[in-house]
């Protein structure tokens, strides 16, 4: 039996968006996210962290800084690293070949195979069109959350055109399914 996986963007989806986040002290988890992640894991979902970090590729900071920010996020949420089945940190700049950088579906497709995930039961959740597009490129459902980048009318139309749902936040997306009220 195939498992369900949820591919989660970091900045603007799990934590407040800070351009080129490079200071762990600036990490601020969004309200209710820790509880939602715990509930998703308890419900049997495998969680995957999928984040573009071109600041590394641009030479703004080192990979250790990204790991420190991820560790701080987990510490503030009182979660262990095992909450995520796998983590993809895409360091390519936008002008470089897109190996893992969203909207590339490579990490998703590799994870689907590695973890025997169901295409129908899995999804991508993020706050930007590149997050959504990675899911669409992999052939899995995608959803936008309004906790990071603004979801304007043009983006809403694009989302509707591609049957992409839009939610106020990650918790709102799963509130009924997980009884998070």
Locations of regions flagged by a protein language model:
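Active-site neighborhood of HAD-like aspartate-dependent phosphohydrolases
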Residues: 1-48
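Acidic active-site catalytic centers that drive phospho-/nucleotidyl reactions
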Residues: 9-11, 52, 127, 131
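Ser/Thr-centric signal marking residues that sit
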Residues: 13, 51, 147
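Catalytic P-loop NTPase motifs of RecA-like helicase/translocase cores
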Residues: 14-16, 57, 131
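A short acidic, helix-capping loop that chelates divalent metal ions and anchors anionic groups
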Residues: 18, 23, 55-60, 93-98, ...
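Substrate-recognition element of Asp-dependent hydrolases with the DxDx(T/V) motif
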Residues: 33, 37-70, 83-96, 135
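Asp-based, Mg2+/Mn2+-dependent phosphohydrolase catalytic module
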Residues: 64-85, 93-124, 128-181
